[in-house]
């Protein structure tokens, strides 16, 4: 059994880490580089940085941040937000990022996934999907949850895999920031449909939620933000708890 991964997510807006509830109402959660270094020390397996303003405001990517983070942390990290061209990917990887996360750009131009996979390898490409459940149907959203595409979550995840994505990062907008647990039913279904790792995002509020996302949601990795940023859950303690529940972690 592959070890389950714990991944802090740092949403970056105007150079600072922020965390909202259901994609709005941001609180300042500190310097992203300092936070990343702290998480690396505490045993995080990877870190994800998402520039949550980039796609909406059409700004370029986080190359400078990638360079600063690479100098401070020794675990893999992913950067997303405004990645639209191969040059963006190349610049981020050259600056020290291990992977790039695509969301809006992949839905608008699905072949971009294939271009990245061909040029840099599937392992570099994380397809991030923001989805919301309405009347039992999960649909994908664009631009930080502002635009409903009407596209089915499960159909798009399988398409992304076939196009060359190496991982799926699924955020449940219904669960994001509200700390009532992950979307385990949808995650379990997703895990049956795709054959690439699924990262669960949205809903972490307790150590038990992490246990459930692995045992019930069958996620390969769990991503969270505010519970880590504001000290509600310590990563090293979380891993000890998971080991005690017979979940393999690094």
Swiss-Prot record:
Pathway: Amino-acid biosynthesis; L-histidine biosynthesis; L-histidine from 5-phospho-alpha-D-ribose 1-diphosphate: step 5/9. The keyword Cytoplasm applies. Keywords: Amino-acid biosynthesis, Cytoplasm, Histidine biosynthesis, Lyase. Its EC number is 4.3.2.10. InterPro entries: Aldolase_TIM, His_biosynth, HisF, IGPS_HisA/HisF, RibuloseP-bd_barrel. GO terms for cellular component: cytoplasm. The keyword Methyltransferase does not apply. The active site is at residues 11, 130. One of its GO terms (molecular function) is imidazoleglycerol-phosphate synthase activity. One of its GO terms (biological process) is L-histidine biosynthetic process. It catalyses: 5-[(5-phospho-1-deoxy-D-ribulos-1-ylimino)methylamino]-1-(5-phospho-beta-D-ribosyl)imidazole-4-carboxamide + L-glutamine = D-erythro-1-(imidazol-4-yl)glycerol 3-phosphate + 5-amino-1-(5-phospho-beta-D-ribosyl)imidazole-4-carboxamide + L-glutamate + H(+). It holds the Pfam family His_biosynth. It is found in: Cytoplasm. IGPS catalyzes the conversion of PRFAR and glutamine to IGP, AICAR and glutamate. The HisF subunit catalyzes the cyclization activity that produces IGP and AICAR from PRFAR using the ammonia provided by the HisH subunit. Belongs to the HisA/HisF family. Heterodimer of HisH and HisF. PANTHER family: IMIDAZOLE GLYCEROL PHOSPHATE SYNTHASE HISHF, IMIDAZOLE GLYCEROL PHOSPHATE SYNTHASE SUBUNIT HISF/H IGP SYNTHASE SUBUNIT HISF/H. This is Imidazole glycerol phosphate synthase subunit HisF. It comes from Elusimicrobium minutum (strain Pei191). The gene is hisF.
